[in-house]
């Protein structure tokens, strides 16, 4: 294991560009699925057509039942960010675990964000119909609503949190993630464009691809693009 770690660090040191993919395993769904209460709540969210609440529900389960594991993962990612800070790098994630976004993914001196999560999470809210004015940051009052809703779910109850209304159409806002009926992708598009521009600059340069914890839930975000990038880099 130590030899493998040293080999990876050496490859990163020698590379001009580093692309990191953080996958769905950071949601810890495998461990969550072992809990009957999690499976019950997830099924209830599906039945009520409010699966957009799932990223918040999963965050609460991790906080309650897996705090040590999540803290260890966060510590490891902070170390990775420190290793990468002198490199030209980008991190793309298919996970909806907001803890990944809280890691200081910034390039030294430039202090520019180097992280994009196209699936969203629970920290922004949107109009269910995708109105332009809909995307907003979740407030402390919203978090209280989310917490109240989660507590009811834990006791076999149910309520949809009141996250406010869309200023344009008046419909109740939902969390901005891929489980929203009409996912408003404007929440991440600016950083995604920066990521695509960064990728264009990597052609014909020495590059390392580091894929961690990815599965097949959303293969178009990490798995398939990484395979294509690796193929182009070999040519």
Predicted region positions:
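Conserved catalytic alpha/beta core of Sir2/sirtuin-type deacylases, generalized to analogous enzyme cores
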Residues: 1-235
């Amino acid at each position: 294991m130590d030899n493998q770690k040293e080999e990876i660090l050496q490859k990163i040191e020698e590379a001009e560009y580093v692309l990191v993919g953080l996958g769905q395993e950071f949601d810890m769904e495998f461990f969550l699925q072992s809990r009957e209460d999690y499976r019950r709540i997830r099924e209830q969210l599906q039945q009520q057509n409010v699966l957009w609440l799932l990223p918040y529900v999963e965050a609460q389960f991790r906080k309650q039942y897996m705090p040590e594991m999540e803290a260890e993962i966060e510590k490891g990612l902070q170390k990775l960010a420190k290793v990468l800070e002198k490199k030209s790098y980008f991190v793309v994630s298919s996970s909806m675990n907001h803890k990944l976004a809280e890691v200081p993914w910034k390039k030294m001196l430039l202090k520019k964000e180097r992280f994009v999560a196209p699936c969203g999470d629970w920290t922004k809210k949107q109009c269910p119909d995708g109105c332009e004015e809909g995307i907003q940051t979740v407030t402390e009052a919203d978090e209280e609503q989310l917490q109240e809703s989660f507590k009811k779910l834990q006791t076999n109850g149910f309520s949809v949190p009141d996250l406010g209304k869309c200023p344009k159409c008046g419909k109740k806002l939902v969390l901005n993630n891929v489980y929203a009926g009409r996912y408003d992708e404007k929440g991440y598009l600016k950083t995604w464009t920066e990521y695509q521009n960064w990728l264009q600059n990597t052609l014909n340069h020495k590059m390392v691809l580091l894929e961690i914890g990815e599965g097949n839930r959303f293969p178009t975000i990490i798995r398939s693009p990484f395979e294509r990038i690796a193929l182009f880099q070999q040519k």
